[in-house]
Amino acid sequence: MAKISLIQREFKRQRLVLKYEKKRTFLKREIQRTPFLKQKLQFHRILQQLPRNSASVRLHNRCLVTGRSRGYYRDFGLSRHVLREMAHQGFLPGVIKSSW
């Protein structure tokens, strides 16, 4: 189980990304569209004043159950350990143990 503080920090980042998503995409689009250097610099300055954690690049995928960041399966939102246990218990419909 990951530390509670790490899980909460990641949750805070997710909220910030959602809060500033429209503003950030608008500013990036305007930087690309504007042919004038002064306006580009002005938009860039506004973009830099946004919180760092509002950038989607700073998000990490974490397991919904344990908060583990490594061995994460995007399709399920779970780490490999939890995925294996839940599959064995039958909590994931359609997931079967492979054999050939």
From Swiss-Prot:
GO terms assigned for molecular function: rRNA binding; structural constituent of ribosome
One GO cellular component, as annotated: chloroplast
Keyword Ribosomal protein in record: yes
Organism field: Oedogonium cardiacum
Regions that span the bilayer: none
Name the UniProt record assigns to this protein: Small ribosomal subunit protein uS14c
Localisation: Plastid, Chloroplast
Binding partners and assembly: Part of the 30S ribosomal subunit.
Principal place of residence: plastid
Cited function: Binds 16S rRNA, required for the assembly of 30S particles.
InterPro entries xrefs: Ribosomal_uS14, Ribosomal_uS14_bac/plastid, Ribosomal_uS14_CS
Gene transcribed to yield this protein: rps14
Family: Belongs to the universal ribosomal protein uS14 family.
GO aspect biological process, one term: translation
